């Protein structure tokens, strides 16, 4: 059993096992289910992610009932096909898949919460991007999810994964860090390098607020998932290059928890502060719900 990232890394290193294998064995022990049963459940998660990504680029794309989001995954796909991108195709593939997944979520479609529905695009963005470019097998993709879940479980148990409790750092931040760690293992990195990637990725997004316009998981949520995917890929490459993070992963999680607890309620999923509290954000809320609930009036 492990309750911290350090314990996870030590366990994997001492037993000469991958983090994904450690997670599979712990899940078997905790649930008293067979390896085949646990593997099949994770395969279902992977299939759900894949279906959302594929749906997002059918025709003109998917659009939310409000019309606030939709069609950006198709735009990114067409842009990638031109072959003249600034960021490189691997990162932009991740961006496309992340955008698409969250557009499906905003359109009331089926997604896999990783770790939440609002942050459901980042991890699929990363796993399918590197699966494309590195020709990953189905097994490697499933193991990617187990690795990510090991890190995510520690975050959930030791801090928070909901925007209502800790801001978007707890949602997209956690998703990005989980994805970075899993990407490192998938690329052949060590458990310690997975931990470094995790802490780099999460550290980059500390303090990120949750400020959904009109209280809907659309603006800025969809694009934040895309940025989370890019952040994860960059953090993974940094770790694989031998770059380390001065602040250990567990302490980075502690920092996120501390920041989240200090974050005002207006910046924790209430749809009152940040971008939600801008003039444009309030106008959108007024148009959708027909009531003026500006933060300024509530403070009066």
Regions found by a protein language model. Name each.
Residues 105, 112-117, 148, 159, ...:
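Short glycine- and Lys/Arg-enriched binding-loop motifs that mark or flank ligand-binding interfaces
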Residues 1-109, 133, 242, 249-300:
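Generic N-terminal targeting/processing segments that precede catalytic cores or assembly contacts
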Residues 79, 102-112, 155-165, 212-217:
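Glycine/charged-rich beta-loop-alpha catalytic/anionic-binding loops adjacent to active sites
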Residues 89-105, 140-159, 203-212, 247, ...:
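Acidic-glycine-rich active-site phosphate/pyrophosphate-binding loop
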Residues 86, 113-120, 132, 137, ...:
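Glycine- and small hydrophobic-enriched segments that form the cores of compact globular domains
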Residues 124-135, 183-188:
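Alpha-helical support elements that line or immediately flank enzyme active sites
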Residues 103-128, 169-176:
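Glycine/serine-rich anion-binding loops at beta->alpha junctions
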Residues 163-171, 175-176, 180-186, 191-300:
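A structural signal for small-residue-enriched, beta-sheet-centric alpha/beta enzyme cores
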């Amino acid at each position: 059993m492990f309750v911290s990232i350090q314990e996870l890394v030590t366990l994997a290193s001492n037993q000469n096992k991958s983090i994904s294998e450690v997670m599979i064995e712990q899940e078997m022990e905790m649930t008293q289910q067979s390896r085949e049963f646990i593997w099949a459940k994770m395969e279902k998660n992977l299939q759900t992610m894949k279906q959302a990504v594929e749906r997002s680029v059918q025709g003109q794309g998917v659009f939310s009932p409000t019309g606030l989001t939709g069609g950006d995954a198709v735009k990114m796909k067409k842009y990638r096909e031109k072959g003249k991108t600034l960021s490189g195709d691997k990162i932009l593939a991740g961006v496309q898949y992340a955008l698409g997944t969250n557009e499906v979520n905003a359109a009331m479609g089926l997604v896999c919460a990783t770790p939440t529905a609002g942050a459901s695009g980042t991890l699929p963005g990363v796993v399918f991007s590197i699966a494309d470019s590195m020709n990953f097998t189905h097994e490697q993709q499933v193991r990617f999810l187990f690795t990510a879940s090991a890190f995510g479980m520690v975050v959930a148990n030791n801090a928070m994964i909901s925007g209502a409790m800790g801001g978007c750092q707890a949602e997209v931040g956690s998703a990005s860090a989980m994805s970075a760690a899993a990407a490192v293992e998938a690329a052949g990195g060590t458990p310690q390098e997975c931990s470094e990637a995790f802490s780099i990725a999460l550290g980059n997004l500390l303090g990120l607020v949750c400020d959904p316009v009109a209280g809907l998981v659309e603006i800025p949520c969809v694009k934040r998932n895309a940025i989370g995917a890019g952040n994860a890929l960059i953090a993974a490459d940094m770790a694989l290059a031998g770059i380390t993070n001065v602040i250990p992963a567990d302490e980075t999680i502690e920092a996120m928890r501390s920041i989240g607890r200090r974050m005002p309620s207006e910046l924790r999923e209430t749809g009152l502060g940040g971008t939600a509290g801008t003039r444009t954000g309030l106008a959108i809320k007024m148009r959708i719900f027909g009531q003026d609930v500006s933060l300024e009036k509530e403070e009066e």
